Amino acid sequence: MSESLRIIFAGTPDFAARHLDALLSSGHNVVGVFTQPDRPAGRGKKLMPSPVKVLAEEKALPVFQPVSLRPQENQQLVADLQADVMVVVAYGLILPKAVLEMPRLGCINVHGSLLPRWRGAAPIQRSLWAGDAETGVTIMQMDVGLDTGDMLYKLSCPITAEDTSGTLYDKLAELGPQGLITTLKQLADGTAKPEVQDETLVTYAEKLSKEEARIDWSLSAAQLERCIRAFNPWPMSWLEIEGQPVKVWKASVIDTATNAAPGTILEANKQGIQVATGDGILNLLSLQPAGKKAMSAQDLLNSRREWFVPGNRLV
């Protein structure tokens, strides 16, 4: 068996917690866990711990929640743990150069794309949005840049026509721990083969916004259908009707040309709500008016047919 490593884990959401769980079953020694401070959540704005903190406390691991790792005293928390390696998964804080250099084997990161494609904050969503045929995870050696470090290990998976960001997130949350455990074994054995990223292939996965998720009917039906899957479950594609936001959960592309202006309602029936776009027709299948649950287009038409009169335009 490979050497058992002393590991600091740094992460915050459920995606990170799944990696911590795998580490705890791997035979390595997790000596400390860093996660973001508790945040207000829910209607009562009660302070809630991160999924990583919940798991770490269940396992009686030391938990640290600094607001920043820039202050010297917070960097000392890392140094005192005398780790071989620091594993970073969706932590949300910048690691200064001094911290990156503290562990014997440095810091490694699990990133939700096949680098150098989709560096940045929203790689899962952007891969769907762009119509990529595949994605995956990259385990990389961290440096001071944004996802610029040498690649240590990659695992890929296909993107299907049904995938949403939610389903892709789950797939990568399965792949990531596999890649992480393999990489740690290679680091412990001295067999890791770092690969420099090709800067000519870099793309950036910019952070999502609710405004970006508003449906722009001038785009093609194919692009809009991908957006709807990419922005599900957050921030959710939406349109506005009579001043109310209506979320769109599912749609399909009807590959028929139309001369109607983008946003024009062409048909509204049990097959869906067909709307002209910049190229082709988008068929809305599942929608969610404000304050309601998601429902089929047919159910929405039963209660709000006046919203979808053929010939009218959605803006």
UniProtKB/Swiss-Prot annotation:
Residues involved in (6S)-5,6,7,8-tetrahydrofolate binding: S113, L114, L115, P116
EC numbers: 2.1.2.9
CDD domains: FMT_core_Met-tRNA-FMT_N, Met_tRNA_FMT_C
Pfam families on file: Formyl_trans_C, Formyl_trans_N
Signal peptide: none
Gene3D superfamilies linked: Formyl transferase, C-terminal domain, Formyl transferase, N-terminal domain
Molecular function via GO: methionyl-tRNA formyltransferase activity
UniProtKB keywords: Protein biosynthesis, Transferase
Transmembrane stretches, start-end: none
Keyword Transferase found: yes
GO CC annotations, alphabetized: cytosol
Catalytic function, reaction form: L-methionyl-tRNA(fMet) + (6R)-10-formyltetrahydrofolate = N-formyl-L-methionyl-tRNA(fMet) + (6S)-5,6,7,8-tetrahydrofolate + H(+)
Top EC class, one word: transferase
Family membership: Belongs to the Fmt family.
Function: Attaches a formyl group to the free amino group of methionyl-tRNA(fMet). The formyl group appears to play a dual role in the initiator identity of N-formylmethionyl-tRNA by promoting its recognition by IF2 and preventing the misappropriation of this tRNA by the elongation apparatus.
Protein's name according to its UniProt entry: Methionyl-tRNA formyltransferase
Species this chain originates from: Escherichia coli O17:K52:H18 (strain UMN026 / ExPEC)
The gene coding this protein: fmt
